């Protein structure tokens, strides 16, 4: 959530930044007018309360001296009524301000490219060279069926579209991947966490999913619970409402969890395969950092995600998302896109973001600065390290062989009991 004081004192800069994120200046102007009216009413309310206090003292004095206080009482009653009217107006204005400010996206960092959509994203670097196949490549969903490791038909029967069963060496490959990912992140100083897979509405507000993106989630009827769309939500909210010791920062968390997404608005997109599912595993990274260190931590986090792809030998590229393509809470985002041979393109497999103090303000996560003793908002960061199902898809396609088998990447073999290849039955 943005700082209302910042909008008030640096309106033109904030308006220009949010315009690049699709927010109209009229919305911000209306917010500014509401804020000005609110501040005026607060002054009036305080003046009237001071007047009421004086009148109350005068009435008490008159009663002590056995004097008639009828007029003073009438005057005080009018003042009290005026205060109530103003307070009711303030409640209404506060709600209007909240309705606007809670759905405003974060302001982009100055280094973020300005653009409308993914066409304006900027490629930063590439790693690895896509393999030159001398046979016709298969899509991962066909490989999965031929190898008897992915069962889409029964997933649809048991649950519905965009669900599947992993089986045999497919299940072992999925498990090997997330264990490998977690082990690599732990080596880099991340604390492993097993989170709840349901959170409450306050947690969804804290990380920015609520109120704007409720349609993208699965809520449990007649409860305050939501299935997590990402482990970012419980990990970030772990410290919600707390003040941390500045000497402890930065703090690194990692977790593997299922992620549940309704994929609202995705009808017709990626209807086959592992790219877009309602339920998938993802290894998440979350950081809590001091403001002056957060962009250095973003580079480290992105490197941590890249490390997984490099050790798996999967070609990828790093993209800096433009202002029009970034997520709601992000101030800056790097996407990692892995090469998918059957589609002859790169597809997103990780997204690493610095939200600066946007989530921390919503969730009230602060730290006490050891230098001056002041309590300040910290910065939160989050990143995929990686989306496991998409990594399975990338391995199946990049490591496929002409005979229909798939070679298991060397780093995963110790996690799979020494298996080296997945062969057709």
Swiss-Prot record:
Location of this chain's protein in the cell: Cytoplasm
Residue stretches spanning the membrane: none
Report one GO cellular component: cytoplasm
InterPro entries named among the record's database cross-references: aa-tRNA-synt_IIb, aa-tRNA-synth_II, aa-tRNA-synth_II/BPL/LPL, Ser-tRNA-ligase_type_1, Ser-tRNA-synth_1_N, SerRS_1_N_sf, SerRS_core, tRNA-bd_arm
Q: Which SUPFAM superfamilies match?
A: Class II aaRS and biotin synthetases, tRNA-binding arm
The kind of enzyme this is, by top-level EC class, is: ligase
Is Cytoplasm one of the keywords? Answer: yes
Where is this protein primarily located? cytoplasm
Q: Which reaction does it catalyse?
A: tRNA(Ser) + L-serine + ATP = L-seryl-tRNA(Ser) + AMP + diphosphate + H(+); tRNA(Sec) + L-serine + ATP = L-seryl-tRNA(Sec) + AMP + diphosphate + H(+)
Pathway recorded for this protein:
Aminoacyl-tRNA biosynthesis; selenocysteinyl-tRNA(Sec) biosynthesis; L-seryl-tRNA(Sec) from L-serine and tRNA(Sec): step 1/1
Sites binding L-serine sit at 230-232, 284, 384
- Enzyme Commission numbers on file: 6.1.1.11
Per UniProt, where does ATP bind? Answer: 261-263, 348-351
Keyword annotations from UniProtKB, A to Z: Aminoacyl-tRNA synthetase, ATP-binding, Cytoplasm, Ligase, Nucleotide-binding, Protein biosynthesis
Q: Which GO terms describe its biological process?
A: selenocysteine biosynthetic process; seryl-tRNA aminoacylation
In alphabetical order, the GO MF annotations are: ATP binding; catalytic activity, acting on a protein; serine-tRNA ligase activity; transferase activity
The record ties this protein, via PANTHER family, to: SERINE--TRNA LIGASE, SERYL-TRNA SYNTHETASE
**HAMAP family per UniProt:** Ser_tRNA_synth_type1
The entry sums up its family as follows:
Belongs to the class-II aminoacyl-tRNA synthetase family. Type-1 seryl-tRNA synthetase subfamily.
User: What exactly does this protein do?
Assistant: Catalyzes the attachment of serine to tRNA(Ser). Is also able to aminoacylate tRNA(Sec) with serine, to form the misacylated tRNA L-seryl-tRNA(Sec), which will be further converted into selenocysteinyl-tRNA(Sec).
Q: How does it assemble?
A: Homodimer. The tRNA molecule binds across the dimer.
Query: What domain notes does the record hold?
Result: Consists of two distinct domains, a catalytic core and a N-terminal extension that is involved in tRNA binding.
Its name, as the record gives it, is: Serine--tRNA ligase
Q: Which organism is it from?
A: Streptococcus pyogenes serotype M6 (strain ATCC BAA-946 / MGAS10394)
Query: What gene does the UniProt entry assign to this protein?
Result: serS
